[in-house]
Each structure stands twice: as structure tokens, then as C-alpha cells.
């Protein structure tokens, strides 16, 4: 069950309080174009799709995943703090030490230094199970058991964030392509394009 996996993750991270909510971020773009960040939420009852969020990333150098993750984390948690929303017990970043460092710095600046941040770095050949897991700003990855419920949970949350980011990116790309196709047709005005 998800609850058992959250207990396992609590033990794996050696936290005092049992984890009840995890949020995970991922970035999707095509060579820096139409960059989307996604955040998914998981609680004891499973994924909470009402808390999923996507962010259109702008004002950064195309392809700069560090700036993109920073913008998404900053926007998401500054709003959550402002609105008094329940914060996660753990934040997961689909990325290595660089993305993790940026996310942790953003959390610290927002006064959320007490929330652990995990980075999942892709392993050799990007194969599932070969990723390295980093906690906060530790230099060495955490030692992990290959088939533990905690690792499985992190992989599932990461994969869901990845899926949500990619579907958002593809929708944005499709919308742009459709819009440019309509603009090239003579005789179609602004009112027709909207419909």
C-alpha cells in the first residue's frame, strides 16, 4: 500500500516524523522550447490529482533546467505559503545534484529549510533502478536497496511527474502548431481562429 511505502521512505531517509505527503517536480521541453514544469502530489491515499500543477516557464535561457526547476519551486511554494496550504513532508526533484541544489536554495529562501529535498539522478543508460538518490546537499548518494518499497515509491512518483510534464509540454506544442497553421490560411480572421 501507499501508506506502507511512505513508512518505508520515512525509514530510508531516517526522518523522525512519518511522511504523509510527497511532491515531485519535473521539467519537459524540446531543446529548451515551450518549457513546462510539473508538480505532482502523493499522500497516504495515493496520487492527489487535485493538487497537480503545471507551470509555463519563461524568462530563462532555453534549455536551462536549473533555472526552470528554480522558477517552478519558487512559484509553487511561495504561493502555497501565502495561501496557508499544507506543505509536503518531502520534495522530490527529477534531476541530479545541480537541480537539487537550486531547489533546496529556493526552499531555504522561502523559510522551508526543514523540508527535505531529494534529487533522483539518472543512472548509466537512463535505466530504471540505476538512478542515484541524493538528499538535501549531501555530496554522496544514499545507499539503497534495489527493490525496497521506498525506492519503488520514489520511482513511481518521479515517473508520474515525468508523465504529467510531458503531456503538458505536448499539449502546449500542439496548440502552438495549430495556431500557426490557422494563421497561414488566408481569409481566416481573429474570430474564426478563436473557435
Across the structure, where does each feature detected by a protein language model lie?
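Acidic, glycine-enriched active-site microenvironments
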Residues: 1-195
